[in-house]
Design a protein with these regions (language model features):
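Generic N-terminal amphipathic, Lys/Arg-enriched alpha-helix
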Residues: 4-14
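Active-site nucleophilic cysteine motif
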Residues: 14-34
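Solvent-exposed, flexible loop/coil residues
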Residues: 19-21, 42, 59
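Acidic side chains
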Residues: 21, 37, 79-81
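Short acidic alpha-helical/loop segments enriched in Asp/Glu that coordinate divalent cations
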Residues: 37-45
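...with weaker cross-activation on analogous glycine-rich loops/strands in unrelated enzymes
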Residues: 48-107
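Protruding loop/beta-arch "assembly-hinge" segments enriched in small, turn-prone residues
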Residues: 107-119
Length: 119
């Protein structure tokens, strides 16, 4: 599956904690690229409170990505690489980063990325 196909497959999906949120969106792409789901042992969560607890137990998104992916300069990020903007896991795509928000997919300028990981 290409990144474009992956993003397109999420266009009509509604936000749902533990099923279609920023973490599952990024983790799903990482699994496609690496063959490993780094969230498997940490599922399920169904509420914002449960998600926050799971992330705290993991050490946070930065820790999860640092432990499992190669950190890179965000200026060197390619399509499909991972970033975190305002606490939201996102994927680089062209001039933007894309993530799942409460109202569907959200896009931000890629220059907002302060960190990145190669996927």
């Amino acid at each position: 599956m290409t990144l474009h196909e992956y993003i397109t497959s999420h266009l009509t999906k509604k936000f749902k904690w533990g099923d279609n949120d920023c973490c599952t969106f990024a983790a799903g792409w990482i699994e496609i690229k690496t063959g490993h789901d780094y969230l498997t042992e940490h599922r399920p969560w169904r509420t914002a409170k449960q998600a926050a607890r799971k992330l705290r137990d993991l050490g946070g998104l930065f820790f999860l990505f640092n432990e499992n992916l190669k950190r890179i300069n965000p200026n060197m990020a390619q399509d499909g690489d991972v970033t975190i903007i305002d606490g939201t896991a996102s994927l680089f795509s062209g001039r933007h980063v894309v993530s799942v928000g409460l109202n569907g997919l959200e896009y931000a300028d890629r220059t907002r990325a302060e960190c990145a990981w190669r996927c």
